[in-house]
Each structure stands twice: as structure tokens, then as C-alpha cells.
Amino acid sequence: AGVIGCGGRGSGAAFNFLNAANGVTIVALGDTFQERVDELAGKLKKDKNIDIPADKRFVGLDAYKQVIDSGVDVVIIATPPVFRPVHFQYATEKGKHSFLEKPICVDPVGYRTIMATAKQAEAKNLRVITGTQRHHQRPYVESYKKIMEGMIGEITGGTVYWNQSMLWFRERQKEWNDCEYMIKDWVNWKWLSGDHIVEQHVHNIDVFTWFSGLKPVKAVGFGSRQRRITGDQYDNFSIDFTMENGIHMHSMCRQIDGCVSNVSEFIQGTKGSWDSSTMEIKDLAGNVVWKYDYEAEKANFKQTDPYTLEHVNWINSIRGNKPLQQASETAISNMAAIMGRESAYSGAETTWDAMTASPLDYTPKDLNLGKMDMSTFTVPVPGKPRDQNK
């Protein structure tokens, strides 16, 4: 495997991959910054006795091409998500199986690239998996089965949450240029992360679209920036999604210290409800009719970590020549989050048809690792014209 993006998530995914199966190794690393590549190379040597020679350590905004062209079989792509569509596109062109960390796009242009590339990957018999680890987490998989069996009846709505304390940030150092600073602080900049509703909360939105089999047709929401320190993003969102059949999903996410936390999903049905915070299904009277058995999982399965299990399933699909292509499904959840974000930013109702056809592109023109016009990166204000919310 080659690893593209050697920060925290890329490093984590690299070790998840190595722990997922025998006979796998990492042979090439790429990142925008030399220190990131060298840090991961050092960890691989220390913990796994894997040597990454200097000629397999690639640096710069085009390092992804060098990793993909270095003779690898598969790629782990974990760069800031604005780059995901282009990196996936190149990997697919070169015939590589891909692990794409979520989110896999931050805007409609990226969404369309992902959807088109996913079709190409299928045509080439490539295995593509995304970092939506709940799809491989047994409590979620078993809950999905119970809901598909009709245990809660017909789904009538739900609420999904990712409310937590403030995420990490980087203060600018005087030796960093504009682009270098933003990439090192990427989770706080709209163009790089897509804002936290896309970058993080997509996990919870994805659970509802997965369990219901529905995509949203419109979104109305709001959000604000209360205590964020760097970047140009919001730190809270609340979105009402109307799904294809008319039911509603309420989505809320927050990254503010000192507030109540909740990372879970709740789905209501005509016969009962499911709550991921307890992994229980209750009937309409509030009686628990099913509960996931964590002790049985520990007793029956050697591996329970979902971050490793997603790599187990990816490797098994490649070795067993079994179809696996999650990019298009994840892209739909991603687009739902984008719809919610754009409604909050603008104060307008967004629709699936309009957003999927939108020319909105967050990637700066003529991007290079140097000076950028920082005045263009402003916090969105609802009710202002779209061209003032870039």
C-alpha cells in the first residue's frame, strides 16, 4: 500500500491496514510536508519494523501522483478532503484500489467527480472503501438488519447528533506561508474540510441515509460561529432535512467547549424506535425488545475495532475478488451534509437537484504552496448574496 496524507488519520489508517491482515505492507508515503512523511516513516520503523526508503517518501501538493505511480497495489487516501476527488480520480485512472477517508468531497463539483470516478472504478473491477466505519461496526450492522426485518416498522423520522467540545486548531507560525498555515490547520477552513457538518457529522447523517435508504430532497437550517478561534467555519449547525418520501431527519452538530455532548443517531418507526447511544430497540410503550450484546461480540470475534474491520473487509474483497464500491453511497451522505451547510450559510432552502448541479467549487484557483489572498476566506453570513459568502 501507499499512504497519501500522513497526518493523524492517515497514520491511524496505515496501522489499521497493517493490523487487518497478514501479508500486507506499506511501501510508499506522500504528504504536503516532509515532517509528516518522516514522522510516519519513523512510527512504521519503530512499531512494525517497516523501512520506507528516501526514494519512496514523496513531498508536495503533487505527492499523491508519485505515490500512486510508485508501484503500489492499493492506496490509502487521507489528505484534507478537498483533495479527495482529484486523488481518487488519479488512483482510479491508474488502476489502484482505494481507501478514501471520509468526507470524500466538500462541494458539488467534487461530488460529481466522485460519482463519475466511482462508476469508472466499478468498470475496472476496483475495490473502493470509505472511512464510514459504522458500516463495518457490528452493533450498527446488526441494528441495520433488525430494522430491515421490520422490528421498528416503517421509518417515520429521526435525529442525528455530533455535539462535542472544540476540535484542535493550529496557531499560525511566522515561518509558515498562507497555504501551509491553512493546510496545517485544515479542520478549521471551509475550503479544506467542508466545515464540521461535512467533515465530521457526515458519519451520523450517513447512518440515517443508510438505514432508511433515502436521500434528502431539501434542507433548511441555520448555524453560527460562537467560539471558534482560527479559520472561517461555523461551530454549530441545526438542519431539518426533508427526505424523498416526505419524512424528516433533524441533524445537529456542535464543536464548543462546556456544552453537553452527544454523538449518536435516533430513528423512529411505526412500531418502535432505535437508539445508537444504547444500541437498543424499544416498542412504542418504551419496552426494550432488542439490545446489542457487546459481551457476545468480544467472546466470538477476535477483532472488534471498526477502524480495523473496514480494512479487513477491504482486503478480503480484493483478495476474494468480491465487489465493493462505497464511494457513491458515501457521496450521497456527503451531499446531504453539503446541502445542510449551504442552507445554514445562506439562510435559504437548498434542494438536492439544485445542489447536485451547482457550479460551487471550494478549491482555490491556481492553488500553490505559497501566498494566498486571505481576504477571500470569510465567515458566511446568512441572508447575504452567495458571492459574498465565498
What are these regions (language model features)?
Residues 1-48, 208:
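N-terminal Rossmann-like dinucleotide-binding module
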Residues 66-86, 99, 106:
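Rossmann-like NAD(P)-binding element
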Residues 244-248, 271:
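Glycine-centered tight beta-turn/hairpin loop motif at sheet-sheet or coil-to-beta transitions
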Residues 11-13, 199, 203-216, 220, ...:
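C-terminal helical cap and adjacent loop that interface with cofactors, partners, or active-site loops
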Residues 47-77:
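A structured beta-alpha segment of the ubiquitous adenosine-cofactor-binding alpha/beta core
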Residues 85-136, 150:
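Beta-strand-loop-alpha-helix segment that lines the small-molecule cofactor/substrate pocket
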Residues 5-9, 124-130, 134-231, 239-241, ...:
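Predominantly a Rossmann-like dinucleotide-binding segment in NAD(P)-dependent oxidoreductases
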